[in-house]
From Swiss-Prot:
Subunit structure: Part of the 30S ribosomal subunit. Contacts proteins S9 and S11.
One GO process term, biological-process aspect: translation
Alphabetical list of InterPro entries matching this protein: Ribosomal_uS7, Ribosomal_uS7_bac/org-type, Ribosomal_uS7_CS, Ribosomal_uS7_dom, Ribosomal_uS7_dom_sf
Keywords carried by this UniProt record: Ribonucleoprotein, Ribosomal protein, RNA-binding, rRNA-binding, tRNA-binding
Molecular function terms, GO-annotated: rRNA binding; structural constituent of ribosome; tRNA binding
CDD domains: uS7_Bacteria
Lineage: superkingdom: Bacteria
Family recorded in the similarity comment: Belongs to the universal ribosomal protein uS7 family.
Name of the protein this chain belongs to: Small ribosomal subunit protein uS7
Biological function: One of the primary rRNA binding proteins, it binds directly to 16S rRNA where it nucleates assembly of the head domain of the 30S subunit. Is located at the subunit interface close to the decoding center, probably blocks exit of the E-site tRNA.
Signal sequence residues: none
Keyword 4Fe-4S: no
Amino acid sequence: MPRRRVIGQRKILPDPKFKSELLAKFVNIVMVDGKKSTAEKIVYGALELMAEKSGKDHLAVFEEALENIRPSVEVKSRRVGGSTYQVPVEVRPVRRNALAMRWLVEAARKRGEKSMAQRLANEMLDASENKGTSVKKREDVHRMADANKAFAHYRW
């Protein structure tokens, strides 16, 4: 292994409008081909639509939606003596957020509404009410982990 110094993780700047680091990360996940200003328009537009429909605070609904999508356990493949087991492992907090945001954007992209802002807003509203594709994804991951609970002792 190289003996160079370990490079620390880059500090992400909070987004300019709401001063939220989580929202800045979300904008980066929505971003395609480096078009950050377009991604910001989409995210801020979605937050406006969401606040309009729900009558709640922008960030409150966003946080609630993410909370309902965050997985607590996932399965990782592990080879033991020629066979591969799906071993349930706990998800680290940073990865929880990353997975939740990624699943939210993936689910929004698959929706049928006209604009991406509308899709994102509706998916976040659904997620905040514990329904929608992104919440289903989390439940599928949890179900997989539950089904493979017998292999939990193979953790590393």
